[in-house]
Amino acid sequence: MIQPQTLLNVADNSGARELMCIRIIGASNRRYAHIGDVIVAVIKEAVPNMPLARSEVVRAVIVRTCKELKRDNGMIIRYDDNAAVVIDQEGNPKGTRIFGAIARELRQLNFTKIVSLAPEVL
């Protein structure tokens, strides 16, 4: 579960290394975000000489959470870290590579470009 002020790792090569969640896109009073939700975040740590700089406000989609994700068939998926992928206004990733495994639920939420770039889909 991701809430405002949560720090997330960045799972792509967009230039950001760490994000802090500011807001959850959706209903005005949503408290937590889960895998597949879009958030507004600020870049807390970035790679030098890259397009994205520190303290820049971006949109990101959550691809991994430490909180368990329960599927309809009873399977429970849990990751070791909280991670997100930086996206643009259309939902396309800003980076060209995705690092680490991502959940299959992103395909159903029309993030097919992120799923196609991922090395492993669970």
Curated annotation (Swiss-Prot):
SUPFAM superfamilies associated with the record: Ribosomal protein L14
InterPro entries tied to this protein: Ribosomal_uL14, Ribosomal_uL14_bac-type, Ribosomal_uL14_CS, Ribosomal_uL14_sf
Family membership: Belongs to the universal ribosomal protein uL14 family.
Record's keyword annotation contains Zinc: no
Name by which UniProt lists this protein: Large ribosomal subunit protein uL14c
Domain of life where this protein originates: Eukaryota
Keywords: Chloroplast, Plastid, Ribonucleoprotein, Ribosomal protein, RNA-binding, rRNA-binding
Location of the protein in the cell: Plastid, Chloroplast
One Gene Ontology CC term in the entry: chloroplast
Keyword Coiled coil: no
Main location: plastid
SMART domains: Ribosomal_L14
Function, in words: Binds to 23S rRNA.
Alphabetized Pfam families for the sequence: Ribosomal_L14
Organism, scientific name: Daucus carota (Wild carrot)
Subunit-level organization: Part of the 50S ribosomal subunit.
MF GO annotations: large ribosomal subunit rRNA binding; structural constituent of ribosome
Alphabetical GO biological process terms: translation
